[in-house]
Amino acid sequence: MSADRGPELVSARPGLRAPISATDAPTSAPDVSVLVPAKDEAENLPLFMELASQAFAGSGIRYEVIVVDDGSVDGSWTVLEELRGRYPFLRAVRHRMRRGIADALRTGYLHARGRVLVFYPADLQYKPEDIPRLVAPILSGDVDMVTGYKQGKYEKRFVSQIYNGLSRKLFQLPVRDLNSVKAYRREVMDAIPIRPDWHRYMIAVAAAQGFTVTEIPVPLYARHAGRSKFGLGRIPIGVLDMLAVWFELRFGQKPLLLFGVLGAMLAAIGVLAGLTLVGIRIFAGFGYRPLIDLVVLCVIVGTVLFVGGLVGEMIAAQRAEVRELRRRLDEVER
């Protein structure tokens, strides 16, 4: 368990806590909440806010931008404090240490009030001018989730194509790009588990739960300032996460489907081996010790797996109850 106790909601003076965030919240509930994880993005935040203001100007969409400072050490929080006087739509939350994009999105979600949420990084590789296009199909009631489809030249294109290709095959998804900006109904966030680094697979998890998904092309630009926080070392982690998500979606709700089948197969092998052993003993007049060991092993392991599947079913039921309780608590806190 991390020593981080949660998001720090502070005012300009150290030690004081604001009731909601570092910025005064608008009185009317917005239609759209833009969630912006930011780790050492002090140079990008002023331009991001300016472009966000321009993007929504004249759109008729009520909005807020929630920046989650994810343990920045470059003065990003100070910049946010300065920006709040210029942009009334800005709200800010601070993590005491880096917790990753998934946790930042979860924190932003807990403080968001819009019925549509948007994940948008602060590095300006995606321009805020595309946000109204992302949210339009959701606000009109056509779909539950919209993901961007990257356009233009960018680093790691080959790796991205392989990753997205594997994801489409594994999860049977109708979209071409999982690792881009996203907009979604807040019910999507209510329904899906967000574990570390699983934000990449929000589309897969949402689609598996029956939410409708579409994509729109969005230009990808060079980073405005700062440096990327992700390198090639993230590739093995991404592959393992992909397999973990697939396993969760396939067997998370019905663990007996996996462990029960494996247990039954091993038990069947044990029974067949036992019958073979009896036949050898009766008709050939001698025993075969390795076959006895195989019978015992198969029966024991098969029984353990089957019982493990039953225990897994009980755990799955408890997880569903906890998830529903958490959703209701989140609604009360909002």
Predicted segment positions?
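Structured catalytic core of nucleotide-sugar glycosyltransferases
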Residues: 2-154, 193, 326-327, 332-334
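Acidic-residue sensor for enzyme active/binding pockets
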Residues: 41, 64, 215, 313, ...
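Intrinsically disordered, low-complexity Ser/Thr- and Pro-rich stretches
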Residues: 15-18, 22, 188-190, 212, ...
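Membrane-embedded multi-pass helical conduit in multi-pass membrane proteins
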Residues: 253-334
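Surface-exposed charge patches
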Residues: 54, 78, 187, 204, ...
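Conserved catalytic loops of nucleotide-sugar-dependent glycosyltransferases that act on lipid-linked
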Residues: 100-105, 109-112, 125, 129, ...
